[in-house]
């Protein structure tokens, strides 16, 4: 793991190399690149010295044998001389046809894929459960079947093995409780 300070020093080192390469290209008669404002690079020491209350800048420590694996890219893009900046900055996802239009991979709807998976494992999904025989004859036991795909670990909240959302959540499902046995209040009578 590379420390934040070492990462900042390595980023500073890369910027210094870039500016040195840009200056060399300008001195050799090649196209000179504009100097980028690099926040961590001190072009000249301050004539007044360090600010009061601030420690003077330490020289960079020698590099150790540690390596950065997958370091995040710099926020400012510094291009080397000879690289063209005309590349498109918009990432293209998905395969393209010769006409340049994107091809969408066919996706099955969630409800269809769930139904097909459920039909394939129908025999394994139904588990017989004996619910309180209450002294009945064992030969006359009736088995109640429920699908084991719903977790019953949330008892007593999932007593019917029907989740309100989560497993087969759909955005247009209305999860509010409706009471059909209560007649609506007659507001005219209440106000009088």
Curated annotation (Swiss-Prot):
Instruction: Report, as the record phrases it, the tissue specificity of this protein.
Output: Detected in the sperm flagellum (at protein level).
Q: Which portions of the sequence form the region Disordered? A: 24-108
Pfam family, any one: CIMIP3
Q: What is its main location?
A: cytoplasm
Q: Which InterPro entries match?
A: CIMIP3-like
Any idea where this protein resides? Cytoplasm, Cytoskeleton, Flagellum axoneme
Q: Does the keyword Acetylation apply?
A: no
| Keywords for the protein's UniProt record, in alphabetical order | Cell projection, Cilium, Cytoplasm, Cytoskeleton, Flagellum
Q: Does the keyword Protein transport apply?
A: no
Q: Which domain of life is it from?
A: Eukaryota
Sequence ranges of Basic residues compositional bias: 55-64
Family of the protein in this entry: Belongs to the CIMIP3-like family.
Q: Quote the protein name from its UniProt record.
A: Ciliary microtubule inner protein 3
The gene for this chain is CIMIP3
């Amino acid at each position: 793991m590379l420390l934040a300070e070492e990462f900042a020093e390595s980023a500073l080192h890369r910027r210094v190399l870039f500016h040195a390469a840009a200056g060399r290209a300008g001195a050799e008669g090649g196209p000179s690149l504009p100097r980028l404002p690099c926040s961590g690079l001190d072009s000249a020491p301050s004539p007044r010295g360090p600010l009061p209350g601030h420690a003077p800048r330490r020289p960079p420590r020698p590099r150790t044998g540690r390596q950065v694996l997958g370091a995040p890219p710099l926020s400012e893009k510094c291009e080397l001389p000879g690289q063209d900046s005309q590349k498109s900055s918009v990432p293209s996802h998905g395969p393209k046809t010769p006409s340049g239009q994107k091809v969408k991979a066919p996706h099955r709807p969630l409800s269809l894929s769930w139904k097909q998976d459920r039909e394939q494992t129908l025999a394994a999904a139904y588990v017989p459960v004996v619910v309180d025989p209450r002294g009945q004859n064992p030969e006359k036991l009736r088995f109640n079947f429920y699908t084991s795909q719903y977790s019953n670990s949330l008892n007593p909240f999932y007593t019917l093995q029907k989740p309100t959302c989560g497993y087969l959540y759909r955005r247009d499902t209305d999860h509010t409780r409706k009471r059909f046995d209560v007649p609506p209040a007659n507001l005219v009578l209440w106000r009088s």
